[in-house]
Structures are given as C-alpha cells and as structure tokens.
C-alpha cells in the first residue's frame, strides 16, 4: 500500500491524543493488525482459550487480507489454524442482526469442513467460532461476559463433542467476568476493543510490546489516506446495512401494528365475554362437567 500520510510535524503514536477514529472494533482494522502482529494474535488466542503462550507452538492465519485489494463486502472474520490441529474462526459483530444464530452455525460448519471428498474423517480438526460483540445477538439470553456453547444431550446434558462449538465474548458485560476470565486476560482484551481514545489505549498497552505494536499500526492506518478511505468505505457500508435493517424493522412494525392492535382488542373482548359466560354459568349452577 502506498503510504500517503496526513500527519502534523512530530505527530506519532506516542504523542497521539484524543479520539481514535478507527478502533479495534473496525473489523478490517482488527483483521489487519492481528495478521501482522503474531504476538498480539497469540495473546488474544490465549485469552479466548484460557491457555498459556507456551502452549502455542504454531499459529497461522488462513485468510490474510490485502488492503490494496480489500473491498467493503470482504468477509472480515479471521480464520486461523492453531498448532496444526485446531481451527479458530474469530469475528467481530458490532452491528445488529436478527440472523446471527443461523449465520454463526453456518460459519462454524464451513470452518469445520476442512477435508476434501474421500479424505479421512480423522483429519477433521477441532473447530470453534469466537464472536466478539457489543450487540444482543441471542434473544432472551441471560447476560454473560463469556459464554460457551456446545452440542449436548437434552435429557442428561452429556456433551456430544467438545470439538465443535461457539464462544461469545460480550464486551458490554465486563462487570460479569469471572475470576478465570480476569486471569485469562479476557477483560483486558475487552477493554482494548472498547478503547476509543489514544490515552485509554496507551494506558492499556503500556509495558506490553505486542499491544504497543498494535497501537502503532492502528495509529499509522488512522493517518494513512488510502487506508482511511478503505476503512471509511467499510464503515459506511456497515452503517448503511444497519440502517436498512433498522428501517425494515420500523416499517414492518408500522405495517403490522394496526393488525396487532386489532387482534389485541378482539382477544380482550373474547376474554371479557368468556368471563361473563363463566359468571352466568356459576350464577345458574351450571357445572363444567
């Protein structure tokens, strides 16, 4: 990428102050800096899995992006192979959707299907989809900071397999983090994603070379004209999709509300009539039998 900087004299990551225009919650930013910083990616993987860095022998991003060719429609989840025997699919979901449950299952299945026709099933790798979000994606779910979902038997709750699952990191619920979540640095990472000013980010990155490296890359991309054009294009696309979604919901409510109100009115009348008839039956000694 041709670097066309829009910097003032002496302006660097170390001296940056104020609002970060494109943060780690930009999925294009997130994908790019994670594929560039093995140290940061290792730290995030360890936090999500609850393992130590010494357990990471090899980590390989299967779908790196090229900012020279990135488009607003590009899928921005990170698919990686850990220690050559496990697939991790990490995605940011920062816009509302009614279809995340179906989509997450589809993405998980696609990631799990890593063998060709005629290959041995033993070559399949353990696969987990990790969703990092600030949205309410599962209706009626109890608030939880880090939720883990597996296939289980409904009767005895025995786990079908631990090699196929979905984990959700809910950025809005850091106050519900467990001691294990804190020890595994999940709250630290959640705060990195939520950092919207350079002061907040640098305070978190202090004495952590891998995160300082990420901060430097975020700074550079925020002041690279070509990168900013891509990031802004993607943001507008996401916002447009979110607006169309919200508009569709509002329009549907407007269209259906008269029908809903009419049904409620009819239901109330039926309930009143039923109560009146029950009172008459009781008054005249008529039994239900």
Task: Place the predicted regions along the sequence by residue.
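Generic amphipathic alpha-helical segments used as scaffolds and interaction surfaces in large
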Residues: 32, 176, 180, 201-205
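Short, charged alpha-helical interaction segments and adjacent helix-coil junctions
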Residues: 2-18, 88-93, 187, 191-289
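Non-catalytic, well-ordered alpha-helical scaffold segments
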Residues: 27, 39-42, 124-127, 166, ...
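Accessory alpha/beta interaction modules
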Residues: 1-165, 175-177
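Generic structural signal for hydrophobic core residues of well-folded globular domains
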Residues: 33, 48, 172, 192-193, ...
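Short intrinsically disordered coil segments
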Residues: 144-150, 182-189, 233-235
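Extended serine/threonine-enriched, polar tracts that run as long, contiguous segments within proteins
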Residues: 158, 163-187, 193
């Amino acid at each position: 990428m041709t670097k066309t900087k829009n910097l003032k004299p002496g302006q660097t990551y170390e001296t940056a102050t104020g609002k970060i225009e494109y943060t780690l919650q930009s999925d294009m930013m997130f994908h790019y800096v994670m594929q560039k910083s093995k140290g940061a990616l290792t730290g995030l993987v360890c936090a999500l899995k609850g393992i130590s860095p010494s357990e990471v022998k090899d980590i390989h991003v299967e779908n790196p992006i090229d900012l020279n060719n990135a488009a607003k429609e590009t899928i921005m989840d990170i698919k990686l192979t850990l220690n050559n025997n496990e697939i991790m699919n990490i995605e940011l979901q920062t816009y509302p959707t009614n279809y995340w449950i179906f989509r997450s299952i589809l993405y998980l299945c696609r990631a799990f299907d890593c063998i060709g026709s005629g290959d041995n099933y033993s070559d399949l790798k353990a696969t987990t989809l990790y969703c990092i979000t600030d949205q309410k994606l599962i209706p009626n779910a109890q608030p939880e900071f880090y939720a883990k979902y597996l296939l289980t038997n409904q009767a005895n709750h025995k786990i079908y397999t631990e090699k196929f699952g979905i984990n959700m990191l809910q950025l809005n619920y850091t106050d519900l983090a467990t001691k294990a979540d804190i020890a595994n640095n999940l709250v630290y990472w959640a705060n990195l994603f939520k950092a919207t000013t350079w002061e907040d980010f640098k305070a978190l990155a202090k004495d952590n070379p891998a995160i300082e490296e990420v901060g430097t890359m975020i700074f550079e991309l925020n002041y690279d004209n070509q990168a900013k054009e891509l990031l802004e294009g993607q943001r507008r696309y996401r916002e447009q999709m979110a607006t169309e979604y919200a508009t569709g919901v509002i329009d549907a409510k407007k269209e259906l509300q008269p029908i809903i109100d009419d049904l409620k009115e009819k239901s109330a009348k039926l309930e009143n009539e039923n109560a009146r008839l029950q009172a008459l039956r009781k008054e005249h000694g008529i039994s239900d039998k």
